[in-house]
A protein has these predicted regions:
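Short loop/turn microsegments at loop-to-beta-strand junctions
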Residues: 6, 49, 103-105
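Short aromatic/hydrophobic contact patches that present stacked aromatics
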Residues: 6-8, 51, 77-79
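Core segments of cupin and vicinal oxygen chelate
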Residues: 9-58
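Vicinal oxygen chelate
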Residues: 11, 25, 56-60, 71-72, ...
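A charge-rich, low-complexity, intrinsically flexible signal that marks solvent-exposed coils, linkers
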Residues: 41-43, 74-76, 157-158
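A generic structural micro-feature
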Residues: 44-50, 70-72, 133
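C-terminal cap/linker of serine protease catalytic domains
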Residues: 132-158
């Protein structure tokens, strides 16, 4: 049964490649269907992959090969919670090392321009603590690209 809510992500032409990458990178992620265009359309031809149904950490998504009209930006991102530095490094390196780009505060973009937040729970816990602990956590995070959990935990302790 199809879910009531699905995130639709517009790609130029690489929705299938992106979905396969996400399925190989993140747990509870898979490609569930590939649909080909039944006729020519403005950004493709009959038989080209038009849409791809997939999940990213259990979130249902639809990749649409709609052409170059619209680009991904930071207004939408997937936030992936991590439990340790190894997991943080693995996801970060998979995204950045596969043609992506580093950004600040745990944010990065994949090679298709989709934004990701690779967010250790130690960071979110420190920011949620309030008061001086949250301030120290925030100040430690601000100059980071990939989050260094040891530095975050040191800042949390003061």
């Amino acid at each position: 049964m199809k879910p009531k809510n699905t995130i639709c992500l517009w790609f130029d032409k690489d929705a299938h490649a992106a979905a396969l990458f996400y399925a190989a990178t993140f747990p509870d992620s898979k490609v569930t269907a590939v649909h080909k265009a039944p006729a020519d359309y403005p950004s493709g031809k009959k038989g080209d992959v038009l849409t791809v149904e997939f999940t990213v950490v259990g979130i249902p998504c639809l990749g649409l090969n709609g052409g170059p009209q619209f680009k991904h930006n930071e207004a939408f991102s997937f936030q992936i919670a991590t439990d340790n530095q190894e997991e943080t490094d693995r996801y970060w390196n998979a995204i950045v090392g596969n043609g992506g780009k580093e950004s600040q505060c745990g944010w990065c973009k994949d090679r298709w321009g989709l934004s990701w937040q690779i967010t250790p729970r130690a960071l979110t816990d420190g920011l949620a603590a309030g008061g001086a602990e949250a301030k120290r956590t925030f100040e430690a995070m601000m100059p980071m690209q990939k989050i260094d959990i040891a530095k975050i935990e040191k800042a949390r302790r003061g």
